[in-house]
């Protein structure tokens, strides 16, 4: 999926808002390239939705639409004066009613590559590590068994 323009993005958000919330989206939405660990955010003081452009480029359409629906839940509840934060009951109920995700999946480009894998000899638990582990010094945290490199 290619990155839509600001006008196309606004039209997409308004269309999803009408489809799932039966209300128009009348405020601003734009891409924020500085977002790194989140799919999007709603700024209540400015009534602005910011979206991470990496999710358009690296994930599928359903994942990106889910992020927009999640942020629209924050938006519409804030406009109505209801609880719009993650822990509020109104927010959780609206997420469930619209089929919006609670969290977005991690970006493929942000996932770690583990160079070393160790397995406990006794319980079989697998540890993934970026750095090498001294197997004589460290043991399994679950059963205290010794480790072997896979």
Swiss-Prot record:
One Pfam family named in its UniProt record: SprT-like
Protein origin, superkingdom: Bacteria
Active site: 71
Needed co-factor(s): Zn(2+)
Location relative to the cell: Cytoplasm
One GO location term (cellular component): cytoplasm
Molecular-function GO term, any one: zinc ion binding
Example of a GO biological process term: response to stress
Domain SprT-like, residue spans: 11-149
SMART domains (alphabetical): SprT
Cytoplasm is among the record's keywords: yes
Note describing how the cofactor binds: Binds 1 zinc ion.
Keywords tagged on the record: Cytoplasm, Metal-binding, Zinc
Protein residues bound to Zn(2+): 70, 74
InterPro entries for the chain: SprT-like_domain, Uncharacterised_SprT-like
Annotated family: Belongs to the SprT family.
Name of the protein: Protein SprT-like
Organism whose genome encodes this protein: Oceanobacillus iheyensis (strain DSM 14371 / CIP 107618 / JCM 11309 / KCTC 3954 / HTE831)
Source species taxonomy: Bacteria, Bacillati, Bacillota, Bacilli, Bacillales
């Amino acid at each position: 999926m290619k990155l839509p323009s600001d006008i196309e993005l606004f039209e997409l958000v308004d269309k999803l808002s009408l489809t799932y919330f039966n209300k128009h989206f009348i405020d601003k939405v734009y891409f924020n390239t500085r977002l790194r660990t989140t799919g999007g955010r709603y700024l209540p003081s400015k009534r602005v939705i910011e979206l991470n452009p990496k999710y358009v480029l690296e994930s599928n359409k359903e994942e990106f639409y889910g992020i927009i629906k999640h942020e629209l839940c924050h938006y519409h509840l804030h406009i109505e004066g209801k609880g719009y934060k993650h822990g509020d009951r109104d927010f959780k109920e609206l997420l469930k009613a619209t089929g919006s995700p609670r969290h977005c999946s991690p970006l493929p480009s942000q996932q770690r590559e583990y160079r070393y894998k160790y397995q406990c000899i006794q319980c079989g638990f697998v540890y993934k590590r970026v750095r090498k582990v001294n197997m004589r010094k460290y043991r399994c945290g679950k059963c205290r068994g010794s480790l072997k490199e896979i």
